[in-house]
Amino acid sequence: MQAIAKNDIKTGTVVDLTHEGHGVVKIDRFPIFIPQALINEQIEYKIIKVKKNFAIGKLLNINTRSENRVAPPCIYYERCGGCQLQHLSYEAQLEMKKEQVINLFQRKAHFDNSKINDTVGMTDPWRYRNKSQIPVGKNEQNEVIMGFYRQRSHDIIDMESCLIQDSQHQEVMNEVKSILKDLNVSIYQEQLKKGLMRHLVVRTGYHTDEMMIIFVTNGKKWPQKNAVVEKILDAFPNVTSIKQNINDSHSNVIMGRQSITLYGKDTIIDQLTDSTFKISDQSFYQINSEQTEKLYNKAIEYAQLTGNEVVLDTYCGIGTIGLYMAPLAKHVYGVEVVPSAIEDAQQNATINQCNNTTFVCGKAEEVILQWKAQGIKPDVVMVDPPRKGCDETFIQTLLTLEPKRIVYISCNPATQQRDALLLAEKYQLEEVTPVDMFPQTTHVETVALFNLK
């Protein structure tokens, strides 16, 4: 193999893309990963890091451009780590995400008879985020800065706009930056673990336009609190809720456990199709409401509900998918380990007048065995776990339950593939549909249908 050393300048043709969207050039089968390089491009690059099994390169010049390359519309794209694919046409982004799923399920796990559908995309893949979490800091000139982190760092890129956030959020961000500066509010400095203002979090109801503004502070005492609220109301008189969240943990966790309502309601309301949901500052709620409706509609299609089925909604959160399905089911049982989420789910059931739902707090693998002992046998099980996927004990419990169908929503297809191999003992993976919940990024969600053999 050719010698490869740091700072070498080389040329080559990009033959593949990684799941992170990096171009792959190979030298005698040794891969070099190059951010922002695209398949079939002939490029010049510099080796910046060499590892045992791969190297990292920096793109210097593109000698032959891909037909899928586009000019990134965001002026911060080269520095900000929030988006990874703005240089790739949206049609090619959707195809790339489908290829990721094919690679995981067919090429690696050999689910050769399982259908992989086209990625479900957006008509307008911008301004889709209904929740923004914006770090606050100071620059070398001691000026207040707000924006998003540089890739793989906690260096804040000072911004005035973000093209994937709700447009209202950037208006709030810019106004808050001015308010913090004018009122000389203490700013948290992560390295020193001192200062007050850590993050600004903004949530909006996609269909209702209700807005919640949350100030995350390092401690409860905040001398300028009332003045800040007054200025926010002057600028945004239609704001629904203003809250202070206290996070004095000095960790990377954005929000703490305690929140105080400074103005308005404790929650905001949003809708998904015909269902209404109450959302608190800490509720888990899908970021892209438009795509969530498409995701859930595909899940309902897979569930094949006729009105006679008992549905078990595991990892149910605030009850979104369970309540979405309730009008089409005989009864929905939801289980979630987070107590506040179950409280929200129960309230959301009341709001939607769903009398055929039961929500219980606990570990799914334990609660469903209790339900089984009570004679409750689900026809359909909904699974929507966190990125780490399902606990193996849960999978084994599910295998003993033997529902007719399992509909598995995943925000991490790699762990979904791992779990699919365990489910294969008794279940046939019929098909997988990728859904683009986060355009311009490498993230892809999937919904999969498993039928009992």
Swiss-Prot record:
Gene3D superfamilies, A to Z: 2.40.50.1070, Nucleic acid-binding proteins (2.40.50.140), Vaccinia Virus protein VP39 (3.40.50.150)
CDD domains named in the record: AdoMet_MTases
Keyword S-adenosyl-L-methionine annotated: yes
SUPFAM superfamilies (alphabetical): Nucleic acid-binding proteins, S-adenosyl-L-methionine-dependent methyltransferases
Superkingdom of origin: Bacteria
Chain positions recorded as S-adenosyl-L-methionine binding sites: Q286, Y315, E336, D384
GO molecular function: 4 iron, 4 sulfur cluster binding; metal ion binding; rRNA (uridine-C5-)-methyltransferase activity
Residues at the active site: C411
The keyword Lyase belongs to this UniProt entry's keyword annotation: no
Keywords annotated in UniProt: 4Fe-4S, Iron, Iron-sulfur, Metal-binding, Methyltransferase, S-adenosyl-L-methionine, Transferase
Spans traversing the lipid bilayer: none
Residues reported to bind [4Fe-4S] cluster: C74, C80, C83, C162
EC numbers, comma separated: 2.1.1.-
NCBIfam families the record matches: rumA
Family: Belongs to the class I-like SAM-binding methyltransferase superfamily. RNA M5U methyltransferase family.
Protein name in the entry: Uncharacterized RNA methyltransferase SACOL1957
